[in-house]
Swiss-Prot record:
Amino acid composition bias (Basic and acidic residues), ranges on this chain: 181-191, 245-262
Protein name: Bud neck protein 5
Domain of life: Eukaryota
Organism in which the protein naturally occurs: Saccharomyces cerevisiae (strain ATCC 204508 / S288c)
Chief location bin: cytoplasm
Length: 448
């Protein structure tokens, strides 16, 4: 509360300062009044002895405006007078307006309201030399000071009145704007209606026909139906003027029923089948197609023939190693066994096979010996390199290189070991064949 009271006091003092500044500016402007008017005012004061401060202020203001209009040289002074009425904020007021921005709009109309009362004070001060001895002047001063005190004390009431005046003015402006907008809309609506009426056709459009129009429509349709030579098309009577849904359904049914009747009464005269027939109709077997002589069965039989031709063309090729006949005679089996045994017993074929097999066996034995020696050598190299790496006499880079070399040698050793195993398998197969034929029937088996 203390802060609010301090702010109010500062605001009141600032308002008083602003009012004094405005009074000084009004005094300066009143000094520009013509001397004739001053003399008239002085005569009235001398005769009556009472100064009407409000009337003097009004006459001074009106005379100032007339003088500005008549004298072009005084236009600059009048403009100063007009600009002087605008509230110019000082440094203190600017600082206070930052604290209370909501009170700025309230104080401005209050200052404008107080200008009228204080013009009387300013005018009375300017004419003190003329009315110094009059008692009415003292009364005017007392009344002005009382008004000033009332204005400073009852600031909240004046603020409330100013707020009410602002709200009323805003309401009046809003109502004026609203009425202007409504008038503009009404004008636009009338213009649009006039344009639409200008674009309308001169003849009236009747959605429903009655009486004579219905009879005319039926006569036209009868003439049209009688002019048609096709017997399937029949005259249709259209009733105009009913509900929209009923007319829509009747037109849809009228479009569908003639199509269905034509499809039933007029079969396919060309004898061919349409794409819809091929989808809906069922194919009849070939036996029934012989009995029935219809075009549809003929078409189905042709379709079956085309399918058979397609199947014949896309048939798989036969297997050349297919078994044609299987005989269950025991003599044929015995003969086949004897022939297979006699191949090796024949004197012509045995030397050739033995020579080729002996050459292959020698090559396989030589290759097997070479691979076994190679594997032994690689294993020795790998062991030597691993021993060198285990001693730790090499640097880090050399150790990494040695490790990569050992890995590659191990891969090469595995490859050669696999090849050695395969060669040994082939060699053992050839030796088993020789044992089966009886060429090498004796084996010396010993233990080391």
């Amino acid at each position: 509360m203390g802060l609010d009271q301090d702010k109010i006091k500062k605001r009141l003092s600032q308002i008083e300062i602003d009012i004094n500044q405005m009074n000084q500016m009004i005094d300066e402007n009143l000094q520009l009044v013509e001397p004739a008017e001053d003399e008239a005012v002085e005569d009235n004061v001398k005769d009556t002895g009472v100064v009407d401060a409000v009337k003097v202020a009004e006459t001074a203001l009106f005379s100032g405006n007339d003088g500005a209009d008549s004298n072009p040289g005084d236009s600059a002074q009048v403009e100063e007078h007009k600009t002087a009425q605008v509230h110019i904020p000082t440094e203190n007021e600017a600082n206070k307006s930052t604290d209370d921005p909501s009170q700025l709009s309230v104080t401005q109309p209050f200052i404008a309201k107080e200008q009228i009362t204080h013009t009387a004070i300013a005018i009375g001060d300017s004419y003190n030399s003329f009315v110094a001895n009059s008692a009415g002047n003292e009364k005017a001063k007392d009344s002005c000071t009382e008004n000033k005190e009332d204005g400073t004390v009852n600031i909240d009431q004046n603020r409330g009145e100013a707020d009410v005046e602002i709200i009323e003015n805003n309401d009046d402006e809003w109502e004026d704007e609203k009425s202007d907008v409504e008038e503009g809309r009404v004008d636009k609506g009338t213009e649009e209606n006039s344009e639409i009426e200008s674009f309308k056709s001169p003849m009236p459009q009747n959605n429903t026909l009655g009486g004579e129009n219905k009879l005319d429509a039926e006569l036209v349709l009868d003439k049209f139906s009688s002019a048609n030579k096709d017997l399937d098309i029949q005259p249709q009577t259209i009733v105009v003027g009913g509900d929209n849904e009923y007319n829509h359904e009747s037109s849809r049914l009228a479009d569908q029923t003639p199509h269905d009747d034509n499809s039933e009464n007029c079969p396919n005269r060309s004898g061919g089948s349409t794409p819809l027939d091929s989808q809906t109709k069922i194919f009849i077997p070939k036996k029934n197609s012989k009995e029935d002589g219809t075009n549809i069965n003929h078409f189905n039989s042709d379709g079956d023939g085309q399918k058979k031709m397609a199947n014949f063309e896309t048939r798989r090729p036969t297997n050349p190693f297919r078994v044609i006949s299987v005989s269950s005679n025991s003599n044929s089996r015995n003969g086949s066994r004897k022939s297979s045994l006699n191949k090796y017993d024949s004197p012509v074929s045995s030397p050739i096979t033995s020579a080729s097999e002996l050459g292959s066996i020698a090559k396989l034995e030589k290759r097997h010996d070479y691979l076994s020696m190679k594997c032994i050598k690689l294993q020795k190299e790998i062991d030597y390199l691993n021993k060198m790496n285990a001693q730790g006499s090499l640097s880090m880079e050399d150790g990494k290189r040695l490790h990569r070399a050992v890995v590659k040698l191990q891969e090469y050793l595995d490859k050669k070991t696999k090849e050695k195993y395969e060669v040994g398998v082939l060699l053992s197969r050839h030796l088993r064949k020789q044992i089966d034929r009886g060429e090498n029937g004796q084996f010396w088996i010993g233990t080391k």
